[in-house]
């Protein structure tokens, strides 16, 4: 019997993301906005768009639309890098901090609800298995 693990994991990510999007809709944000804000927040200040894209694990052109939206919402600013005029640096605005705090609460509550009834040992085991699968895939890609 063929394993459906890949499809199962893909479906899990899809429904998890859809729930996050649903929960963030009242804040006029999406899971993509959250991942971007979270990474800007956790990285050292004034990251370039290239560095941010690498941290998130996406291509820079894919990031630009999300950054445009966050800039339109007044949550980030972008400015030309003094050392490389082709590069843009990203900075959170003062308005972003309370939004990040509120979204963190929504994400934490949602995660807690999703993981309800699953022990910390089970979560640790699943996390370990996912990391091992990822390492196997990376190894295969580098062959």
Swiss-Prot record:
DNA-binding annotation, residue ranges on this chain: 49-72
Q: Which GO terms of type biological process are on file?
A: response to stress
Q: Which Gene3D superfamilies match?
A: Winged helix-like DNA-binding domain superfamily/Winged helix DNA-binding domain
Q: Name one GO molecular function term.
A: DNA binding
UniProt keyword list:
Activator, DNA-binding, Repressor, Transcription, Transcription regulation
Q: Does the keyword Cell division apply?
A: no
Q: HTH marR-type domain location, by residue?
A: 2-135
Q: Matching Pfam families, A to Z?
A: MarR
Query: What family does this belong to?
Result: Belongs to the SlyA family.
Binding partners and assembly:
Homodimer.
- Record's HAMAP family? HTH_type_SlyA (MF_01819)
What is the recorded function of this protein according to its Swiss-Prot or TrEMBL entry? Answer: Transcription regulator that can specifically activate or repress expression of target genes.
Q: What is this protein called?
A: Transcriptional regulator SlyA
Organism of origin is Edwardsiella tarda
The gene behind this protein is slyA
């Amino acid at each position: 019997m063929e394993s459906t693990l890949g499809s199962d994991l893909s479906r899990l990510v899809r429904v998890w993301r859809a729930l996050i999007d649903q929960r963030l809709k009242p804040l006029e944000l999406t899971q993509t906005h959250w991942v971007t804000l979270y990474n800007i927040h956790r990285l050292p200040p004034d990251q370039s768009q290239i560095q941010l894209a690498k941290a998130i694990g996406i291509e820079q052109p894919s990031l630009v639309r999300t950054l445009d939206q966050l800039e339109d919402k007044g949550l980030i600013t972008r400015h030309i890098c003094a050392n490389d005029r082709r590069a843009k640096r990203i900075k959170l605005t003062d308005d972003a901090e309370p939004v990040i705090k509120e979204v963190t609460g929504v994400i934490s509550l949602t995660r807690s609800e999703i993981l309800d009834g699953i022990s910390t040992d089970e979560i640790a085991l699943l996390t370990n298995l996912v990391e091992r699968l990822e390492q196997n895939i990376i190894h295969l890609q580098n062959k």
